Design a protein with these regions (language model features):
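Short loop/turn segments at secondary-structure transitions that flank enzyme active sites
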Residues: 104, 145, 167, 208, ...
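Broad gene-expression machinery/nucleic-acid interaction feature
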Residues: 95, 136, 158, 199, ...
Length: 290
């Protein structure tokens, strides 16, 4: 199986008869990351449900979908589908806008109970891919934001990104900026390949069972952080690279996932997240003690 950082690798889809078997199945439980693969889309289009299980046993218990999460996620899905422009700001200097509607909204609530639905045990996250060329502005990673892919670490120093027409045109900062540039450059297929620097899926987390501090509590083992870091309520997840999962044409391994704290998110000028706190009551789900 491919490592955590190798997204879009064909894996089991290459095995004779496997694709046909999965397309005929009701549900498949992958224990690796099948996202951005062609075979996954084929199976989902055929109606197969997928529940990805890639986190540690303690986290599977803690992050299991609480009562009301699916209802809140479906509400958020409706809001995001109706949105045409998103603006993301922060006191750290982020001011990013993008248009949406060209690609589907993808929603996870922690279980796969609908035909053709993909989910992640521990999920509670929503995202879409921005319309081609529409993302523009500045994104600032601040200390405490999380690089969960390809690394598994809190950001230590500010990283300033300039985004122009859907691509990151400049990366400034110290160690964290160097780590980002080196990874994305290493994923280029040629000198002129800019796909790793494209803006990929953008969205936010809503699972009250997750918390920002879990990475500090559990250490930098990806198995303990794959879901929790992406789904804690009010984070804005910025990413780079592929968009094939949404039906786009960018197929690159240069994927970078950064759940950001303290951002404000506006859907068509209406605030749903204020400085990292969900303020739309219909997106807020009570935490269950476990």
């Amino acid at each position: 199986l491919p490592s955590w950082t190798k997204v879009g690798v064909a894996t089991v889809g290459k095995c004779k008869g496997t694709l046909e078997a999965m397309k005929a199945a009701d549900i498949v439980l992958p224990f690796h990351v099948p996202l951005f693969t062609g075979w996954l889309k084929e199976c989902m289009d055929a109606g197969t449900r997928f529940l990805m299980v890639i986190d540690g046993p303690e986290d599977l218990e803690q992050l299991a979908s609480p009562r009301g999460l699916k209802h809140a996620m479906k509400y958020a899905e409706g809001r995001y589908k109706a949105t045409r422009e998103v603006r993301v700001t922060s006191d750290a200097g982020t001011d990013l806008t993008y248009a949406c509607g060209e690609y589907p909204v993808m929603t996870q609530w922690g279980f796969a109970d609908e035909p053709g639905h993909f989910d992640h045990w521990g999920g509670g996250h929503i995202h879409t891919f921005p319309d081609e060329g529409s993302a523009n502005g500045t994104v600032v990673f601040q200390p405490g934001d999380i690089v969960i892919l390809p690394y598994c670490r809190y950001v230590q120093d500010e990283v300033w990104l300039e985004v122009r027409d859907g691509f990151i045109s400049q990366v400034d900062g110290g160690l964290d900026a160097k780590l980002m540039r080196d990874w994305l450059d290493d994923c280029k297929l040629s000198e002129g390949d800019q796909d790793p620097y494209a803006v990929s899926h953008l969205g936010w987390g809503m699972d009250p069972q997750a918390a920002w501090h879990y990475l500090g509590l559990n250490g930098d083992d990806p198995e303990r952080n794959r879901a929790a870091t992406r789904v804690f309520p009010g984070n804005f997840l910025f990413s780079t690279g592929p968009n094939t999962q949404g039906g786009g044409k960018r197929n690159t391994k240069g994927h970078y996932d950064v759940p950001m704290r303290d951002c404000s998110v506006m859907l068509d000028n209406e605030v749903i997240i204020d400085a990292g706190r969900l303020v739309d009551d219909d997106m807020i789900v009570p935490r269950e003690p476990r």
